[in-house]
From Swiss-Prot:
This is Probable V-type proton ATPase 20 kDa proteolipid subunit. Pfam families: ATP-synt_C. It is a multi-pass membrane protein. Its main location: membrane. One of its GO terms (biological process) is proton transmembrane transport. Keywords: Hydrogen ion transport, Ion transport, Membrane, Transmembrane, Transmembrane helix, Transport, Vacuole. Residues 25-46, 108-130, 192-199 are cytoplasmic. Disulfide bonds: none annotated. It is found in: Vacuole membrane. The record marks E94 as: Essential for proton translocation. The chain crosses the membrane at residues 4-24, 47-67, 87-107, 131-151, 171-191. V-ATPase is a heteromultimeric enzyme composed of a peripheral catalytic V1 complex (components A to H) attached to an integral membrane V0 proton pore complex (components: a, c, c', c'', d, e, f and VOA1). The decameric c-ring forms the proton-conducting pore, and is composed of eight proteolipid subunits c, one subunit c' and one subunit c''.
Length: 199
């Protein structure tokens, strides 16, 4: 078993054991997930969403550039003509990070200074949760998009090294893969548009 699998199963089993212990010893009310959601500041949820959007998007772009760049370098050893033409795949990977930054800027415009006395309202919770889940959605879409564009860019570089006529055909597939990040951008704008500013 891998380290990730072992830690996941250990955490799950320990959570079940602690939950059952609390349930059978009449202290189940102290494990209240709803109070955790309501006691945490809406600012925290909003800022976590913005941070995760940027983090996942940049990880996806970096991962895609790594996958694509290694294939371009490897293929350019045998066919040096591919190195400049296939840089468009690197640019597609960088666009993924730009999508995340655009959403982060749009979401951060909703974060304002307010009076802490009347802060925990339904509107503020909705805005915080909307920014959180919108950021998670956009970030994960861009993570998947970056990997997708990197893999198709790698295939385009290796196909171009073998046969130059295949480059345009594989580039069309790469463009369709980059649309995944655009879908995430649109979903983020829709979710963020429903949320009101913190005021």
């Amino acid at each position: 078993m891998s380290l990730f699998s072992t830690s996941l199963w250990t955490t799950t089993v320990m959570s079940i054991i602690v939950g059952l212990y609390m349930l059978f010893h009449n202290s189940g009310e102290s494990f209240d997930f709803g109070s955790f959601l309501l006691d945490t500041s809406p600012y925290t949820w909003g800022l976590l969403g913005i941070a995760s959007c940027v983090a996942f998007g940049i990880i996806g772009a970096a991962w895609g550039i790594f996958i694509c760049g290694t294939s371009i370098l490897g293929g350019a050893v045998k066919a040096p003509r591919i190195k400049t033409k296939n840089l468009i795949s690197i640019i597609f990977c960088e666009v993924v990070a730009i999508y995340s930054l655009i959403i982060a800027i749009v979401f951060s415009a909703k974060i304002n200074d307010i009076n802490p006395a009347g802060f925990y309202t339904k509107s503020h919770y909705y805005t915080g949760f909307a920014l959180f889940w919108g950021g998670i959605t956009v970030g994960l879409c861009n993570l998947i998009c970056g990997v997708c564009v990197g893999i198709t860019g790698s295939s385009a570089a290796l196909a171009d090294a073998q046969d130059a006529s295949l480059f345009v055909k594989v580039l069309v597939v790469e463009i369709f893969g980059s649309v995944l990040g655009l879908f995430g951008l649109i979903v983020g704008l829709l979710i963020g548009g429903k949320a009101s500013d913190f005021s």
